[in-house]
Amino acid sequence: MPVNSPAPWQTIAQQISQTTGQPFRIQERRSVSGGCINQGYCLVDGEQKYFVKLNQAQQWQMFQAEALGLEAMAATQTIRVPRPICHGSSAGHSYLVLEWLEFGRGNHDSWYRMGQNLAALHQAGGSAQFGWQTDNTIGATPQPNPWTDSWADFFAEHRLGYQLALARRRAGNFPDPAVVVPKVKQLLGDRQPTPALVHGDLWSGNGAILTTGEPVILDPATYYGDGEVDLAMTELFGGFPAAFYQGYHSISPAEPGYQQRKILYNLYHILNHFNLFGGGYQQQAQQMLKQCLRI
């Protein structure tokens, strides 16, 4: 949760200066959207401008993991992501400084290109196993990423099983993970995709088009998984334009069984939203469990 005590602006400015090699003094600071989890600010010094996320000091590992994910996606040279500048903790806060991006309005070509770029990210390789070099977060929820050989095992145990255990502690009328996990493994069966570097939290608010027309993806929960998890989430919470899917499938054609797997993959996010926010997500998650697992 964001904190109300004064932020360590001087410390942040000093670290920006040290990291970039350019003197930076905050001439202007304004509050901008940081999402449901963090506080967001724009810091300006002449032509230099940065986006800063703030949270409680104990959340510094969340920002460290986000920076690692952004750096890994950038290294593939497939899709634009915000460049992390620096991160740290001071005076009761943790912070992540990113390059400032100017968002515009996308057209058919830019959304088509975003789909192509995401497919290229998914095909970039980089790991023989599923998981990630460190645990990270999905929103504010811890996301475990132990290296795992089997995709069915990874998703069943470390995605749905983990979120279900949290949900049962919040509301006892969810099924036991000990019952659900074997069913998920059976449903995914022998699906063993090549591990893809995925964004991990790609709803419509985390994809945008810059004023230059270049597509960009934001706020990742990165790991190596099934590329379909990203595609599935783009259809949740508003969806992406049709041109995006045309572009994606021009590089990576749709595979049989995706419509069934999509429900399973998006159940992870609905469970996470219940664990974060409660409310109607409980009923939605229970309906999805019945729909895809007959539970």
From Swiss-Prot:
Keywords: ATP-binding, Kinase, Nucleotide-binding, Transferase. Coiled coil: none annotated. Belongs to the fructosamine kinase family. Its EC number is 2.7.1.-. SUPFAM superfamilies: Protein kinase-like (PK-like). This is Probable ketoamine kinase slr1563. It comes from Synechocystis sp. (strain ATCC 27184 / PCC 6803 / Kazusa). It is an enzyme of class 2 (transferase). Ketoamine kinase that phosphorylates ketoamines on the third carbon of the sugar moiety to generate ketoamine 3-phosphate. ATP binds at residues 99-101. The active site is at 201 (proton acceptor). It comes from the Bacteria. Gene3D superfamilies: 3.90.1200.10, Phosphorylase Kinase, domain 1 (3.30.200.20). One of its GO terms (molecular function) is kinase activity.
